[in-house]
Amino acid sequence: MSFLFGGPPKMSSAEKIAAAETEVEMVSDMFNRLTESCQKKCIPNDYREGDLNKGESVCLDRCVSKFFEVNIKVSEKMQGEAAQKQGAPGFGM
């Protein structure tokens, strides 16, 4: 009943595990999308060297930076919209 006094309801162990598993899946998905997208953009299919050259390395660095920048902006936008919905008059009443 802590939700009556402003605190969030307690999560059971099973709920905590499910939430952690969901978070791991989301992070894994984001990593896979990042890897696929930046590799496709920056690394040619015909490898000529064992290591990344300077151009490939710079491209990957910029790609990863942009990917996370966009991810942060999208997350902030979604959190703002969720907060507006929760604070909307008459919501849930």
UniProtKB/Swiss-Prot annotation:
It is a peripheral membrane protein. The keyword Membrane applies. Keywords: Chaperone, Disulfide bond, Membrane, Metal-binding, Mitochondrion, Mitochondrion inner membrane, Protein transport, Translocation, Transport, Zinc. Disulfide bonds join 38-63, 42-59. GO terms for cellular component: mitochondrial inner membrane; mitochondrial intermembrane space protein transporter complex; TIM22 mitochondrial import inner membrane insertion complex. A motif (Twin CX3C motif) lies at residues 38-63. One of its GO terms (molecular function) is metal ion binding. InterPro entries: Tim10-like (IPR004217), Tim10-like_dom_sf (IPR035427). It is found in: Mitochondrion inner membrane. It holds the Pfam family zf-Tim10_DDP. One of its GO terms (biological process) is protein insertion into mitochondrial inner membrane. Its main location: mitochondrion. Belongs to the small Tim family. PANTHER family: MITOCHONDRIAL IMPORT INNER MEMBRANE TRANSLOCASE SUBUNIT TIM10 (PTHR11038:SF16). The twin CX3C motif contains 4 conserved Cys residues that form 2 disulfide bonds in the mitochondrial intermembrane space. However, during the transit of TIM10 from cytoplasm into mitochondrion, the Cys residues probably coordinate zinc, thereby preventing folding and allowing its transfer across mitochondrial outer membrane. Heterohexamer; composed of 3 copies of TIM9 and 3 copies of TIM10, named soluble 70 kDa complex. Associates directly with the TIM22 complex, whose core is composed of TIM22 and TIM54. Interacts with the transmembrane regions of multi-pass transmembrane proteins in transit. Mitochondrial intermembrane chaperone that participates in the import and insertion of multi-pass transmembrane proteins into the mitochondrial inner membrane. Also required for the transfer of beta-barrel precursors from the TOM complex to the sorting and assembly machinery (SAM complex) of the outer membrane. Acts as a chaperone-like protein that protects the hydrophobic precursors from aggregation and guide them through the mitochondrial intermembrane space. This is Mitochondrial import inner membrane translocase subunit tim10. The gene is tim10.
